[in-house]
Structure formats: structure tokens, C-alpha cells
A protein has these predicted regions:
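Membrane-embedded beta-strand positions in outer-membrane beta-barrel channels/transporters
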Residues: 82-85, 125-131, 175-179, 211, ...
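Short glycine/proline- and aromatic-enriched beta-strand/turn motifs that initiate or cap beta-hairpins
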Residues: 35-106, 185, 260
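Transmembrane beta-barrel strands of outer-membrane/channel proteins
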Residues: 45-51, 97-101, 142-146, 193-197, ...
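Repeated loop/turn-to-beta-strand initiation elements of outer-membrane beta-barrel proteins
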Residues: 92-97, 137-140, 186-191, 221-224
């Protein structure tokens, strides 16, 4: 049995700094709008758990590996995770920052089943958006998505020859969308849904984000959220041994604790 390790590391500090800088600009830009009525500015945090299903293809160099992981598979192979969101809002303008970090592993088959392989994926996704309220129930959203993915593949062929490769890439995508929220009846329940689309060839070819959740408010500062989250990334860059592909759908139920501060 022969092992041929190959390591490809690709980093891009500028997009990462750009995403953080853009988030800061969004936050600063919203402040003047509330200078006349500071009491109208509200802060909200959300910490949540996600049970994602992963379905797609991860490619490093000339090797593509299919990934198909259920929520139970994800939890079995989860090495670490953090999921949180901040939302600040005034009378019209606001800001939202959503961060998801996951470290997972998967097994799959590629090239029509001729090869078997293992894939390790570490992913950080951060979304920073400015919001503008059109009505009591509807807001427009525009901002940037920063995605950092590190992947490793161990591939075994028909002759039991093993080839290992690892690579990583990060990129920034513009995103636009809308958010809808409404109370349900006169009680403590409410519904929130959002749809965002981005990429447009700037980083990824296309990014789609859909979320929906029902909230139950326990008191005047906290509530529980139960919902569903869908993310679809279509990204490919480079060629030959420098090629990196991340064509992945991540979707599943989410439950979280929302609190005002």
C-alpha cells in the first residue's frame, strides 16, 4: 500500500479583512440614523443548535468526492461547532451578523464508485448585513458573506493505492435579500422568515440562504426559536492541482435561545 501525500494551502487574508471591515462599516453607517432617538435602538442575540444535512461535492485538485451526511451523521462526526447571531435595529436601519463554525468529517464515493474516500471539512461562515425596514413586517437586506473552508481528502483506488490531498480557500460574496416577520395571533408566538441570494461570480457562482422559524416569547427579554435553515454554496476556483471546489447544500432544523440586551 502506497501513500502519496499532497498538501495545498491557499489563503486570502484580504477577503477576510474585507468582510470584517464591511461589517464595521455597516454598523457605523447605521448609527447616525438613530442619533435623534437612541432609545429606539435595540440589541438582540441568538445562540442556536443546527442539525444539518450535508449534500454535495467537495473537490481538491483533480479529485471530486461526493458528500452525503444526515443530521445524525453530522453529530457523530462533529468535532466542534459555534452558531450565533447578533441583531441591532432602530426605527428604520439595522445590522445583522450571523456566524456559523463547524468542524466535520465524512465518507463518500467518487468517479462512479471506482474510488472510496474520506473527507474532512472545517468551515466558518460569517454573514454581515445592513437592514432597512419597509414596513412593520418587511425589511430589505444587503451585505457580504465570508466563507472559509478547509478540506482534506484521503482516496483509495481499485489497486488499494491511497492518495491524500488537503486544501483550503476563503472568499467573500455580496448578498441581498429580504426578511419577513409577523406576530401570530395575539399571543406570544411569532414567525420570521428570510431569503438571501449572492455570489454572482464575485466569489462563488451562486449562494442561496433560506431561513424560517417560529418563536415563543417567555418574557420581555427572551424567547425560544424553532425553525429550519438552508444554505447552498456553488464555488469553484483554480485548475489542476490548485483547483478547489465546494458545491454543497447544508440544511436542517435549528433550535435556539433569543435574548434582548
Amino acid at each position: 500500500m502506497t501513500v502519496m501525500p499532497t498538501t495545498l494551502k491557499r489563503t486570502c487574508a484580504t477577503p477576510g479583512l474585507a468582510a470584517l471591515g464591511l461589517a464595521a462599516v455597516f454598523f457605523a453607517a447605521t448609527q447616525p440614523a438613530f442619533a435623534q432617538s437612541e432609545s429606539s435602538w435595540s440589541n438582540q442575540g441568538l445562540i442556536y443548535l443546527l442539525g444539518p444535512t450535508l449534500d454535495g461535492t467537495s473537490g481538491i485538485g483533480p479529485i471530486d468526492t461526493d458528500v452525503d451526511m444526515s443530521a445524525s451523521d453530522v453529530f457523530e462526526t462533529l468535532d466542534g461547532a459555534f452558531l450565533g447571531m447578533y441583531r441591532g435595529e432602530g426605527e428604520r436601519w439595522g445590522v445583522m451578523i450571523d456566524v456559523v463554525y463547524m468542524d466535520l468529517k465524512a465518507e463518500g464515493a467518487g468517479d462512479g464508485g471506482a474510488f472510496s474516500g474520506k473527507v474532512e471539512v472545517e468551515q466558518t461562515t460569517a454573514i454581515a448585513s445592513a437592514t432597512y425596514r419597509l414596513s412593520p413586517s418587511t425589511q430589505l437586506m444587503a451585505g457580504a458573506l465570508y466563507n472559509d473552508v478547509s478540506a482534506g481528502i484521503s482516496l483509495k483506488g481499485p489497486t488499494d493505492r491511497i492518495r491524500e490531498q488537503s486544501a483550503g480557500d476563503d472568499w467573500v460574496d455580496p448578498i441581498v435579500g429580504a426578511l419577513f416577520e409577523t406576530p401570530i395571533g395575539a399571543g406570544n408566538w411569532s414567525f420570521t422568515g428570510s431569503a438571501q441570494i449572492g455570489g454572482f461570480g464575485v466569489g462563488a457562482d451562486l449562494v442561496t440562504i433560506l431561513t424560517g422559524s417560529f418563536s415563543y416569547r417567555f418574557n420581555n427579554w427572551s424567547s425560544i426559536d424553532i425553525g429550519y435553515r438552508y444554505l447552498d454554496f456553488d464555488y469553484e476556483d483554480g485548475d489542476g492541482l490548485e483547483r478547489f471546489k465546494f458545491d454543497m447544500k447544508e440544511h436542517g432544523p435549528a433550535i435556539g435561545w433569543r435574548f434582548d440586551f
